[in-house]
Curated annotation (Swiss-Prot):
Expression across tissues: Expressed in the vascular system of roots, cotyledons, young leaves, fully expanded leaves, stems, flowers, and funiculi of siliques.
Annotated coiled-coil segments of the chain: none
Protein name: Acetyl-CoA acetyltransferase 1
Gene from which this protein is expressed: ACCT1
InterPro entries: Thiolase, Thiolase-like, Thiolase_AS, Thiolase_C, Thiolase_CS, Thiolase_N
Length: 415
């Protein structure tokens, strides 16, 4: 066990991150597609608790994000928690704030600790976009004469702006037009995301984050262990530049290559109060210093991080000049580019290990995943303060400020 933090560095109600884990991110219908979102969630929670050296029996509450809940069964967060060995007596709540669900879960967990309601809480998010069903909306009334309409549950509940009746990618095009961000700039950013992600993978920086996942390959055949983000292995810069626009045929700039990919994955964080960290002698990786939400018109969600981030930094009692690294979820390359422009960010300090364009974007997972990755960036680059933000459908965004506390590896030395 790592040495305990000194009592002069923590206040009793400080929110401390003592364990983190994420699964590798699997491609759509790819390496993790045989596992449900709740199973992926269980794997991440179990690993985070093990790395934190926290007995599951000590957990008081679980907040876990999940967006595409159809066909998962009742209370997905509870399924994930019980599957990780957390007792029946623990309260579990599933959070759906679209793409920000995982981060909002961490924010709610933090509030419960700050208010003195809890001392040990697990938070995070999960998604298996590969397993989202398609709907027969008229079947309940009876399927009579004629053809039936099949509705894609993933599009309907995850990727569609219900207010304007168009796909999320159209919002990316609106953003690109408004801020005059070209196709070439978006492609260059996407290539950079892949290059940074591949570099982090090749230098084992993601090993600190990832819990390997064992996947069955069928009866009588040995299982395989997935320990790398699947999307990074399919990078082809030349092909990326030739892809056609996906959402705007004439003059469009958002493509499948410079947008995030449909993916599967889960991420979890173990949060404890400063008082409990001292009592149990836990290794504190980071403190949560502040957080905030923001919202504007639904079709403008792409730039809402630029509203949420300053609010979170102010609530943390910091100045933007003190922030070492940022993570802004790459729903589309244009999202990172627009918010970088609006906030005047140094490109070298934004998404330093790649992002959703290269790694993938499992909706309910991503808000938690970027927090785990931000901690990895701060650890690798010896930063102190980091800010993560993620936009969400409907016009919103969430942001959270972390203070990195230690350069020591959490959990086992293998990490």
């Amino acid at each position: 066990m790592a040495p305990p933090v000194s009592d002069d560095s923590l206040q009793p109600r400080d929110v401390c991150v003592v364990g983190v884990a994420r699964t590798p991110i699997g491609d759509f219908l790819g390496s993790l597609s045989s596992l449900t979102a709740t199973r992926l969630g269980s794997i991440a929670i179990q690993a985070a608790l093990k790395r934190a050296h926290v007995d599951p029996a000590l957990v008081e509450e679980v907040f876990f994000g999940n967006v595409l809940t159809a066909n998962l069964g009742q209370a997905p967060a509870r399924q994930a928690a019980l599957g990780a060995g957390i007792p029946y007596s623990v309260i579990c709540t599933t959070i759906n704030k679209v793409c920000a669900a995982g981060m909002k879960s961490v924010m709610l967990a933090s509030q419960s600790i700050q208010l003195g309601l809890n001392d040990i809480v697990v938070a995070g998010g999960m998604e298996s976009m590969s397993n989202v069903p398609k709907y027969l909306p008229d079947a309940r009334r009876g399927s009579r004469l004629g053809h039936d309409t099949v509705v894609d549950g993933m599009m309907k509940d995850g990727l569609w702006d219900v207010y304007n009746d168009f796909g999320m990618g159209v919002c990316g095009e609106i953003c690109a037009d408004q801020y005059r961000i070209t196709r070439e700039e978006q492609d260059a950013y996407a290539i950079q995301s892949f290059e940074r992600g591949i570099a982090a993978q090749n230098t084992q920086l993601f090993a600190w984050e990832i819990v390997p996942v064992e996947v069955s390959t069928g009866r009588g055949r040995p299982s395989v262990v997935i320990d790398k983000d699947e999307g990074l292995g399919k990078f082809d810069a030349a092909k990326l530049k030739k892809l056609r626009p996906s959402f705007k045929e004439d003059g469009g700039s958002v493509t499948a290559g410079n947008a995030s990919s449909i993916s599967d994955g889960a991420a979890a964080l173990v949060l404890v109060s400063g008082e409990k960290a001292l009592e149990l002698g836990l290794h504190v990786i980071a403190k949560i210093r502040g957080y905030a939400d923001a919202a504007q018109a639904p079709e403008l969600f792409t730039t809402t991080p630029a509203l949420a981030i300053p609010k979170a930094i102010k609530r943390a009692g910091l100045d933007a000049s003190q922030v070492d690294y940022y993570e802004i979820n790459e729903a589309f390359s244009v999202v990172a580019l627009a918010n970088q422009k609006l906030l005047g960010l140094d490109p070298e300090r934004l998404n330093a290990h790649g992002g959703a364009v290269s790694l993938g974007h499992p909706l309910g997972c991503s808000g938690a995943r970027i927090l785990v990755t931000l901690l990895g960036v701060l650890r690798a680059k010896k930063g102190k303060y980091g800010v993560a933000s993620i936009c969400n459908g409907g016009g919103g965004a969430s942001a959270l400020v972390l203070e990195f506390m230690s350069e020591k590896t959490i959990g086992y030395s293998a990490l």
